[in-house]
Design a protein with these regions (language model features):
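Charged, helical or coil segments that form electrostatic protein-protein
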Residues: 87-126
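Short, charged, low-complexity loops and linkers
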Residues: 28-43, 75-76, 100-110
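Short, basic interhelical loop/turn and adjoining N-cap
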Residues: 73-91
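Short, amphipathic alpha-helical "recognition" segments used to contact nucleic acids or chromatin
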Residues: 35-78
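Extended hydrophobic/Leu-rich segments
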Residues: 14-16, 27-31, 48-58, 83, ...
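Leu/Val/Ala/Ile-rich N-terminal alpha-helices, chiefly Sec-type signal peptides and the beginnings
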Residues: 1-47
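Generic alpha-helical secondary structure signal
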Residues: 11, 60-62, 82, 106
Length: 126
């Protein structure tokens, strides 16, 4: 399994270990400037919402995240607190699609993981 995300506990931030994940439609959709525009970042270039969503995905779904052995309900609660997502952001269909895609990647039922690995290998050959 490719480790797409990590968590920088020193700075309390999500780290994208494999930027190729943003080539996957469901994750690219989280990353648009329009979607990420907010009061703190009117142009959306800092991707504040996208990073909050990735924090939730990592904390709630990733098998290597802190608390991954906890119950799904507790993981959800902790992920909501850690990410700062609102209920409206959590129920957003684009975000929920990214959550489902990440579960597929975790379960190995998606061809995206091997496809990204192949893409990465080809880049290293160049």
């Amino acid at each position: 399994m490719i480790k797409f995300f990590g968590y920088d506990t020193t700075n309390n931030k999500i780290v994208i270990n494999e930027p190729e994940i943003l080539l996957v439609k469901e994750f690219a959709d989280l990353w648009t400037n329009e979607r990420n525009a907010c009061k703190e970042d009117p142009e959306g270039k800092q991707k504040l919402r996208g990073f909050r969503e990735l924090v939730y995905i990592y904390m709630a779904i990733d098998w290597g995240a802190p608390g991954s052995k906890d119950t799904p309900a507790n993981r959800h609660k902790y992920a909501m607190e850690a990410s700062g997502l609102t209920e409206e952001e959590y129920t957003d269909p684009i975000f929920r699609a990214a959550c489902r895609k990440y579960r597929e990647l975790q379960d190995g039922s998606s061809t995206v993981g091997p496809l990204i690995q192949t893409f990465r290998n080809k880049l290293h050959e160049i």
